[in-house]
Amino acid sequence: MYSIKMRSSNQDVHISGAETICEFDKIEQTVQRFYNKGFFHENGQPDFLNIKIQKIMEPIQQIKALQIIEDDKANLQHLTQECGVTEQALNQGMTYIKNETVYTGAIILSAISGKRLDSFGQRGIRATHFSFEDMNNKGDLNERVTDALAIASCINAHPYVKGELCVSDDLTYTTGYFASAKIGYHRLFDIKPVNTRYGGRIIFVDDRIDLNHYISFLESTPKQVVYETV
């Protein structure tokens, strides 16, 4: 198995990213797909694109995908409150999402105080070394949803994670999500105005979390997210 990652940017501003884990015979088509995504993206044409291919030498940890909850009227405040995220922490998370800084990874905040707990600056924390396996083989999930669900499932695979809020920084995509192990994966429609680049990924955690161990799991442990509906 091989890990394939793509990142593209323009003048050091993030444009697009993608990754997966695949067999050797799928490398060529995956690289072509990531190349197309990186170079022909609505956020603009990059002046830098990097594709990294690395053989997986460790056992791959299987993670059960979060359940997708279909609720057109999902309310972010109610969802976060149900998961133990305070209003103060949510407001601080939205401040990071709406500021002008384009973060390339997630920001980890205390679910109680909203204080930032990681020290990775604009880089943030990156959930990497993962793939998504749809056991249903129905093809009913598009690439955007499978990528989001895979990341959300990895991020929430820890008992001290209260939940994750994600708002895409793509110009015309205005749907975000809130996800947690407790309540599943909820899409949030019209969470931002169209034609805006603001966005981000916020992870709300219990202050007792072993941050170094958690970050190592997200960034270094090979993971396969398995999606299967009943």
Curated annotation (Swiss-Prot):
Cofactor: Mg(2+)
Molecular function, one GO term: magnesium ion binding
Enzyme class: ligase
Organism: Staphylococcus aureus (strain bovine RF122 / ET3-1)
The protein's name in its UniProt record: 6-carboxyhexanoate--CoA ligase
Keyword hit for Glycoprotein: no
Origin superkingdom: Bacteria
UniProt keywords, alphabetically: ATP-binding, Biotin biosynthesis, Ligase, Magnesium, Nucleotide-binding
Residue ranges of the TM segments: none
A Pfam short name: BioW
Catalytic activity entry: heptanedioate + ATP + CoA = 6-carboxyhexanoyl-CoA + AMP + diphosphate
Pathway assigned in UniProt: Metabolic intermediate metabolism; pimeloyl-CoA biosynthesis; pimeloyl-CoA from pimelate: step 1/1
Membership in a protein family: Belongs to the BioW family.
Complex and partners: Homodimer.
Function statement: Catalyzes the transformation of pimelate into pimeloyl-CoA with concomitant hydrolysis of ATP to AMP.
